[in-house]
Amino acid sequence: MTPGHAALIAVVDDDEAVRDSLALLLRLHGFATREFASGEAFLEWAGTEPADCVLLDLRMATLSGLDVQAELARRRLGWPIVMLTAHGDVATTRAALKAGAFDFIEKPFDGEVLLQTIRAATQRSAERRTQAEREARFARDLERLTAREREVLGHVLAGRHNREIAVLLDISPRTIEVYKARIMDKLNVDRLPDLVRLALEMGLGRE
């Protein structure tokens, strides 16, 4: 979901009446939908558009919801999945949640509960997309660092002070300060603690 665009929900259910009622409910509440009568049809489409949530029937005639979930994981499509389950289908529901499903809704579903769950799932999707964009931007910014700047950054993340880094690199502490300023400028941060926090969040500096 991007600003000004409705969140896109993929509805996957082999029961036409259920599929149509779900799509209608979602569209009436501002969501865009794509409907699929089978797991195979959905998987053929998956990846052609970025879905914000997948509403997935657990038990279908051919590919099951668990099968579809496993294939999405194999393709690294991290869309939040809300499983539609029959009442009492506890063991399979537990398996879906253990495999990473966002939540489940029992049939016959309560419209308001379903909408609340979908909104929470699309919020998760938006957060993941924002994080992915931050990571991509950081990776691009990191490419701008020189080899020496990367070396200095590594020492900073290891907790070393200017004098220690200066001795290790055989340069002056003042030069270390210059390198730090350049690094912060290239990585778009204003303070050293913010630089350290950002780098650690992005996976740098870990043993």
Regions found by a protein language model. Name each.
Residues 19, 61, 85, 89:
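The feature encodes the CheY-like receiver
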Residues 89-91, 105-118, 164:
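C-terminal output helix
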Residues 136-174:
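Helix-turn-helix DNA-binding segment
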Residues 37-38, 62-68:
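Acidic catalytic/metal-coordinating carboxylates
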Residues 49-55:
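Active-site beta3 strand of CheY-like receiver
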Residues 181-207:
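Basic, Lys/Arg-enriched C-terminal extension of HTH/homeodomain DNA-binding domains
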Residues 3-18, 22-26, 39, 54, ...:
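Conserved acidic segment of CheY-like receiver
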